[in-house]
Amino acid sequence: AYFGEWADDLREKRDGLLGKVLVAPVVTGADGKALKASAEGADFVEFPASGKGDVRLSQPIQFKETLMQYGAKAGRSDTEGKLDLELVPAAAGSNTFVLHFKGKPLAKTEVTVFGPPKWEKRFHSDENGRIEITTPWPGQYVLEAAHVVEEAGQTDGKAYTKIRYVSTLTFNVTK
């Protein structure tokens, strides 16, 4: 797992922001079982996954008065959402997705697609939460969506006034 800004070729370092935000990630394999880190480098954490299917990571991060609920998924074979906010393919390997928030389609939400060669395009989910993207080049694609809920609460003794859910989906295209 790498953390950073794909479009800017930025990978956060363990002795910088990555070390501050990646405190206790929950990583699950396709079977839903938790994975433990097997290796760490200056800018990554490795989680061994066996078998086929998507791997998910979730990590809450509090920034001032906002609780960030970060979720990431690698792969587009699972057609059922498991994260609070998740782009779910309509069929395994499909370029049509439904943006789910807590199990229900999320309409009229911006989804940004990043792809080679540093290409970026914004889409909006329709009234049924669906988007259809194009993947014109071979290589890695990253999709990102966010949703804010005005909901106050506390975590680890710190108050927040809203929750910002951020979800990324990463997959590779071969042609």
Model-assigned labels for residue ranges:
Residues 3-40:
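N-terminal, post-signal-peptide region of Sec/Tat-exported proteins
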Residues 35-39, 121-126:
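Short beta-strand segments within Ig-like beta-sandwich modules, predominantly Fibronectin type-III
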Residues 37-53:
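A surface-exposed beta-strand-loop module
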Residues 1-9, 88-101:
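Beta-strand-rich structural segments
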